[in-house]
Structure formats: structure tokens, C-alpha cells
Regions:
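The catalytic "switch" region of P-loop NTPases
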Residues: 1-18, 22-27, 63, 155, ...
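Walker A/P-loop-proximal flanking segment of P-loop NTPase domains
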Residues: 1-70, 77, 420-451
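Conserved Walker B
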Residues: 178-184
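Alpha-helical lid/collar subdomain of P-loop NTPases
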Residues: 289, 293, 297-379
Length: 451
């Protein structure tokens, strides 16, 4: 079992070798659009946290550098991970350093000019010249002269920088791929956006911003206030807006097969396991990074919980997967259930609610999956309650089960019968599981949780 996830890589000689989500068609069409763009443009690529944006950007870079593209339309490609490469805290210097690493510039003129500008130089020079004064009309003549000189120096530096950048992009064009912007400090992210918009506005330069728009909007509001129209503000920075499409069910299965090989846990390839763990990405987004973390969490807990062939007793692995999902979706309910303080019917109602999108009235998973999930949750809850309540009596009659199920969930339509039969099967398969053993499993889940 591997504890550290392998970093995604894409190479120009085979850009899609590690494409686990079937995104080749999306990448090639997106890159074709970038190559065909004339003049200057800023393109935003929006996707929720953990949707695979970084992998998409890396495949774009590799495809653009491939001989297939370079032989027909040569283009220079610069990758900039704002989270990892924002070393100086100065977006312009960081960006130019990344560009200079890819483009031959013996005299380092681009870097020298960038240093003169000092990323967002106009605003910084105004603050320096005014001594922090807010009322520009109150400036003295000397300060006004300093202010005028600062503006002239900034404008001259801007023109010089754009001239040098344009020369670098003139022959083949330049595509700058910026990733992980929404993970940066709000002030850095906003300054980088302004830098791109106002200093990289050069013919032949195409900028791609891979972002989580919702998260970046929060960064904007943290600076300008909660009532600020952040989405409208962000749209001003891009000329074209693209949306990363979520993977469908077969593509998710391929992703789990990749995780199975990467982590070294064979049970990740079992349908019941991967379908269950994939629920951490429900109900409102694909959450691939959440799924990856859940897979590592599951493998670690399974290794810590399996002793003397315990997993051969029934479906311990499936139960662990379900508990991890419940913890991810509703931690308070999970903790209450683990402590024997949550009734099994309440636990099932919690699962239904957690898996129901905000815009829907029903869970976003198939009935069969939901029944299995509810049955295991109810069974495990019964065991934890037995450990803390001396007078606890398990439900043995279908009629009693159905009545309590409908009261807790508000759902009938034959569901109670399906869940009750699955609960009986689960209870028989997991008859070896004692309250003490259940406690060690939940302790391992809490200990090795990613967050």
C-alpha cells in the first residue's frame, strides 16, 4: 500500500498516457482553440476543487509541446503553478521567472524590466510618493512631482516590458498556462490577475487561467467585502470562459482502476467499493480529489483494521467504505453513530439528506446503491448502540422496521422491504463484528482521516 499519491505527469511524446478520465477529446479541442486564437486573449477554465484541472492543464501543455502540434503550428508553452511557483510574493517577478526559464534571454532583459516595475508598480509608487495619503488633492507640490515622475516611470517600464514580451511571442506565439490560482493568498491572486490583464496584453500572448471561480470569488470578497459583486468582477479579467466537464460513470471507474494500481489495494477495483467511495463526490460536484483522498483513507483504515483474516468475515471492506463516506458527508452524524448515540433510522435519514443535491428532492444515486448503503449504516449503528445501551433490542420484524423507516425518512414506495432484507443479509455476514471491534474501526477512521 502506497501512502503518498503519485503526482500526475504528462509528457509530449505521449500526452494522454495517464489520462484516466477520458479527457483527450476535451484537451485537443481546447488546445486547438488556443492555437487558432489571434492577437491576445485571456481564457478562464473553471472547475470545482478536485475536478482534475491540474491534470487537464498538464495534458494541454504536453499536447501543445508534442510533435503533432509543433510540426504544424509551433508555439511556446509556459506552465506556471501559482501555488508552487509564487516564491517571491510578487506575481510579475514570479511569472517572468517562469517565462525566462523556458525562453532564451541571455541578457535577462525581461527580468530586469519586471524588477523595475515591481508587480503592480503604479499603485505601489503612488503609495510611496504620497506617504500613504488618501486625499490626492492634499498632496504638496513636491509630492505631486514625485507622483508624476512615478507614473511616467511606470508607463515607460510597462511599454518596455510589453515590447520585450511581444518580441518573445512574435515568431511562434506564447501560451501561458496558469494553475492553482485559487489556492493562493487573496491579495496575491488579485494582483496576479491584474498583472496578466494589464501587462500581458500583448499580441501573440494567450493566457489560460485554470480556476475554481466560486473559491476565487470568496478571495475577492475577502478583500472587497461580502457584498461586492465578485463574479462580475472576475468576468472582466477573461475574454472567454470555459467549463471543465465532469467525468461520467465509466470514466470514474477508470479513475478507480488507476487508484487501485497506484495505491496497491486490489479491493478498490470491486464495484461495490468504488461505487461507494465515489459518493464522497456527490451530490453537487465530481470531487476527484475528494475521491482520491477517500481511496487512500479507505486503504489505510482497511490495513489497520484487518487482522488474522478478519476481512474474510463478510464485507468489512464495504462497511469501512460506507463509514468513510458518511464521515465525509456528515461528520457530526458519523461521530454520533460511532458513539452509539444515533438511532439507526436517524442515521439512514442522514445519509439520504447528505446525498440529496440542494436543487433536488431525492438523492442523486440509484435506489440499489442507496438501499445497500442504508442497510449497512443501520446494521453498524445497531452494533454501536448495543455497546452502550444495556437494554438495546435490535429490530427483528419487517413490520416494525418499515414503520420506523417511513417515520424517519418519509419514504415508502417499497423501500423499507428492500432495505430490511439487505440489513438481514448484512447482519448475518457481519455477525462476527462486536461493539469493541466496531470501536477500533471507527477509531482508525478518525485517526487516519485526511481532514
Amino acid at each position: 500500500m502506497k501512502l503518498h499519491p503519485r503526482e500526475f505527469t504528462a509528457e509530449p511524446n505521449n500526452p494522454f498516457a495517464n489520462d484516466q478520465l477520458g479527457r483527450r477529446a476535451q484537451v485537443t479541442s481546447f488546445c486547438q482553440m488556443l492555437i487558432g486564437a489571434e492577437g491576445h486573449a485571456v481564457v478562464s477554465l473553471d472547475g470545482p476543487w478536485g475536478s482534475g484541472k491540474t491534470a487537464f492543464v498538464k495534458m494541454c501543455a504536453a499536447h501543445l509541446r508534442s510533435s503533432e502540434v509543433q510540426e504544424t503550428r509551433p508555439v511556446r508553452v509556459i506552465e506556471f503553478n501559482a501555488w508552487h511557483q509564487g516564491h517571491t510574493g510578487n506575481p510579475l517577478v514570479d511569472l517572468v521567472s517562469a517565462i525566462s526559464a523556458e525562453i532564451s534571454d541571455p541578457s535577462k532583459r525581461l527580468i530586469q524590466t519586471a524588477i523595475k516595475l515591481i508587480a503592480g508598480g503604479a499603485s505601489q509608487m503612488i503609495r510611496a510618493a504620497s506617504g500613504g495619503a488618501l486625499d490626492l488633492g492634499a498632496l504638496t507640490d513636491d509630492k505631486n512631482q514625485e507622483l508624476t515622475a512615478a507614473w511616467e516611470q511606470t508607463e515607460q517600464g510597462r511599454n518596455e516590458f510589453q515590447s520585450q514580451l511581444g518580441a518573445a511571442a512574435k515568431s511562434d506565439g506564447l501560451i501561458l498556462l496558469i494553475d492553482e490560482l485559487d489556492r493562493c493568498k487573496p491579495t496575491y491572486a488579485l494582483e496576479l490577475l491584474s498583472t496578466v490583464r494589464h501587462l500581458f496584453d500583448v499580441p501573440g500572448v494567450i493566457v489560460v487561467l485554470a480556476i475554481n471561480r466560486a473559491e476565487l470569488a470568496h478571495s475577492v470578497q475577502s478583500v472587497y467585502g461580502p457584498n461586492f459583486s465578485a463574479d462580475h468582477y472576475l468576468r472582466r479579467f477573461a475574454d472567454l470562459h470555459a467549463q471543465l466537464l465532469p467525468p461520467d460513470q465509466p470514466e470514474r471507474y477508470e479513475f478507480f482502476k488507476h487508484l487501485q494500481r497506484d495505491i496497491g489495494e486490489s479491493s478498490l477495483g470491486e464495484r461495490g467499493i468504488w461505487e461507494t467511495l465515489a459518493l464522497v463526490g456527490e451530490p453537487d460536484g465530481c470531487g476527484l480529489r475528494d475521491i482520491q483522498q477517500a481511496a487512500h483513507h479507505y486503504s489505510t483504515v482497511l490495513a489497520a483494521s484487518t487482522t488474522s483474516g478478519a476481512n474474510s468475515h463478510g464485507n468489512l471492506s464495504y462497511t469501512i467504505a460506507i463509514l468513510i463516506v458518511l464521515r465525509a458527508l456528515d461528520r457530526n452524524s458519523y461521530q454520533a453513530m460511532a458513539a452509539g448515540q444515533l438511532d439507526g433510522f436517524q442515521a439512514m435519514a442522514t445519509v439520504r439528506k447528505a446525498l440529496t443535491p440542494a436543487s433536488a428532492s431525492q438523492p442523486s444515486v440509484a435506489d440499489r446503491e442507496l438501499w445497500d448503503l442504508e442497510a449497512a449504516i443501520f446494521g453498524f449503528s445497531s452494533i454501536t448502540q448495543r455497546g452502550v445501551k444495556e437494554s438495546y433490542s435490535p429490530v427483528t420484524e419487517e413490520h416494525d422496521f418499515a414503520h420506523s423507516y417511513v417515520s424517519a425518512t418519509g419514504i415508502d414506495a417499497g423501500n423499507p422491504a428492500h432495505v430490511f432484507r439487505r440489513y438481514q443479509d448484512w447482519n448475518q455476514a457481519m455477525s462476527w463484528l462486536s461493539p469493541e471491534r466496531a470501536m477500533t474501526i471507527t477509531a482508525a477512521i478518525d485517526m487516519f482521516s485526511p481532514a
